[in-house]
Amino acid sequence: MAKKIIGFIKLQVPAGKANPSPPIGPALGQRGLNIMEFCKAFNAQTQGVEPGMPIPVVITAFADKSFTFVMKTPPATYLIKKHSGVTKGSPKPHTDKVGKLTRAQAEEIAKLKAPDLTAADLDAAVRTIAGSARSMGITVEGL
């Protein structure tokens, strides 16, 4: 018989830097889960990823105090900022432009984000990424 699920916990944790301090400790502690076990497992799985890159993770908590977790791809905004070389988006995205993103860079981001996007094909995924970039005040060339 399947284990009884008591809840889902969604967090964004920097790759390789999971520790029991907030927000991880309180979120897992409320449900009685082993915080250090999660931290060690998460850090082990994110060893090959750029340190500090935010990784969304969905933790499934079970009634017997065990858990499983699924890592998602990094947020599109983080990848867009990294590829365009800006530190933050524009406060007025449609009037003040802060950076540029080429179609090739948008395709690279779309390929990386493909498992988490609902787009039917690569072109639709590229348009999704381009829309996110435009809403941050970043010009997308080639679209």
From Swiss-Prot:
GO molecular function term, any single one: large ribosomal subunit rRNA binding
The keyword RNA-binding is assigned to this record: yes
Annotated InterPro entries: Ribosomal_uL11 (IPR000911), Ribosomal_uL11_bac-typ (IPR006519), Ribosomal_uL11_C (IPR020783), Ribosomal_uL11_C_sf (IPR036769), Ribosomal_uL11_CS (IPR020785), Ribosomal_uL11_N (IPR020784), Ribosomal_uL11_N_sf (IPR036796)
Pfam families, per the entry: Ribosomal_L11, Ribosomal_L11_N
Post-translational modification: One or more lysine residues are methylated.
Keyword annotations from UniProtKB, A to Z: Methylation, Ribonucleoprotein, Ribosomal protein, RNA-binding, rRNA-binding
Membrane is among the record's keywords: no
An example Gene Ontology CC term for this record: cytosolic large ribosomal subunit
Domain of life (superkingdom): Bacteria
GO biological processes: translation
Disulfide-linked positions: none
Entry function: Forms part of the ribosomal stalk which helps the ribosome interact with GTP-bound translation factors.
PANTHER family assigned: 60S RIBOSOMAL PROTEIN L12 (PTHR11661), LARGE RIBOSOMAL SUBUNIT PROTEIN UL11M (PTHR11661:SF1)
Similarity comment text for this entry: Belongs to the universal ribosomal protein uL11 family.
Subunit composition and interactions: Part of the ribosomal stalk of the 50S ribosomal subunit. Interacts with L10 and the large rRNA to form the base of the stalk. L10 forms an elongated spine to which L12 dimers bind in a sequential fashion forming a multimeric L10(L12)X complex.
Protein name: Large ribosomal subunit protein uL11
Gene of this entry: rplK
